[in-house]
Amino acid sequence: MMGIFLGIVAGLAVLFLLWLAAMGTRRGERQMALFRQYRYAHRGLHNIERGVPENSILAFRYAITGGFGAELDVHLTKDKRLVVAHDSFLDRLCGVHVRIEEQTLEELRKLTLQGTKETIPLLEEVLPLFCGKTPLIIELKVENGNYKELCEQTCKLLGTYRGDFCIESFDPRVLRWLKKNEPFILRGQLAENYTKSGAAPGFPFLARLAMTMLLPNFLTRPDFIAFRYEDRNILPVRLCCGLLKGQEASWTIRHQSELEVAEQAGSLVIFEGFLPKKRAEQPAASEQSQQGAA
């Protein structure tokens, strides 16, 4: 009996070590150090109550004025243009039931954001705003399996960009593509606790479990893990970003107290809905930038 017990323990130990090996990150310490110097306004420094919609040129300008980087979302249109918007269907943002991937840029240009005069920007219009100023976290939004085209078009555009940026996605295929084709681009795996009720509907439980346990890292070797703040204390995150010293990013931070907890743990912070208190190495936000915050 003792032999069986020891065999089980040894087997579990081996599985645990294999899991640790699988979830490791690339550890680009020097490159990630730059990104840790900034905080990142989620979809820009937006505040619709003050006429500043999310993922708009105006929201990005306010973020830069405040000394913040920004996280933004990129979709590929029907005519292969890269536009900055979070939702694929535009009911919430523009009040019309159309899908970005089924529209041309000309068709999208006729729409306005959240009742304002702001329109959906192209990624190529946003990049010059940040170049030489603050970094960008660019999330690629895969729809209907278009990850390859989305990656190709994005990297083609970024190939001439001289600002600081990294790419993240919920879809591991994006990171796998980057690892194979653009290994020098910093890449991050977006994730959350998919085993919770309501998370990632439509995906089999085993697939959701594998994503929660960060198993795709074995194939993608991300530079950082961007995990939902509320889920950051689950075992896979603490092992990957604590024991293995992987870089963590926390989304979406909505209170100063959450920001302080995340930064104390060494996490990048993606915030929304408030203006963070300044820290010693970051200049105070100007009066203009405060107009874009809650």
Language-model regions: role of each:
Residues 2-294:
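Phosphate-group recognition and catalysis centered on beta-loop-alpha active-site segments
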